[in-house]
């Protein structure tokens, strides 16, 4: 696998403490605020007119929860991310035509949210391990493009 045993331990140790539903909504919300062009995929979600509207939007929260639960499932298959995300890759790439760069942006936003939630515990070693994971997931999701 692309993660060492130690890195897997760091990732799983922190992930066990993550409130997946809450963090998912926050990460997707921040993506839409920080990178406004990503909003075009979410036009059916209602009010995205301001940061407050986005962060409070129940559809954004619900989809964020879904996204992070999928990410969570992916962590259980960390040595076969391409397999774990094959169906989602097909949906997002073939059917929704999402630019794979957006998966990378969301991964980086997720890292920011985790740093914000966990403070000192999200030390450089933990961050390095998570950056590898989000890059791996983004690559797996972009797999259909290659």
Swiss-Prot record:
Gene that specifies this protein: HBB
Keyword Iron: yes
Function: Involved in oxygen transport from the lung to the various peripheral tissues.
Cross-referenced CDD domains: Hb-beta-like
Positions bearing S-nitrosocysteine: 93
SUPFAM superfamilies for the chain: Globin-like (SSF46458)
Tissue: Red blood cells.
Residue intervals of the Globin domain: 2-146
Stored InterPro entries: Globin (IPR000971), Globin-like_sf (IPR009050), Globin/Proto (IPR012292), Hemoglobin_b (IPR002337), Hemoglobin_oxygen_transport (IPR050056)
List of residues that carry N6-acetyllysine: 59, 82, 144
One GO term of the biological process aspect: hydrogen peroxide catabolic process
Recorded GO MF terms: haptoglobin binding; heme binding; hemoglobin alpha binding; metal ion binding; organic acid binding; oxygen binding; oxygen carrier activity; peroxidase activity
UniProt name for this protein: Hemoglobin subunit beta
């Amino acid at each position: 696998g692309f993660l060492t045993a130690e890195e897997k331990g760091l990732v799983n140790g922190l992930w066990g403490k993550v409130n997946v539903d809450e963090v998912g909504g926050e990460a997707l919300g921040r993506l839409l605020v920080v990178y406004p062009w990503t909003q075009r995929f979410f036009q059916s979600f209602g009010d995205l007119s301001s940061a407050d509207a986005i962060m409070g939007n129940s559809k954004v929260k619900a989809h964020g929860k879904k996204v992070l639960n999928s990410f969570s499932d992916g962590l259980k298959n960390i040595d076969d991310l391409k397999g774990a995300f094959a169906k989602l890759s097909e949906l997002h790439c073939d059917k929704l035509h999402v630019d794979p760069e957006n998966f990378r942006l969301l991964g980086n936003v997720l890292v920011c949210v985790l740093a914000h939630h966990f403070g000192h515990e999200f030390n450089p070693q933990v961050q390095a391990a998570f950056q590898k994971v989000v890059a791996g997931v983004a690559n797996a999701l972009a797999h259909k493009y290659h």
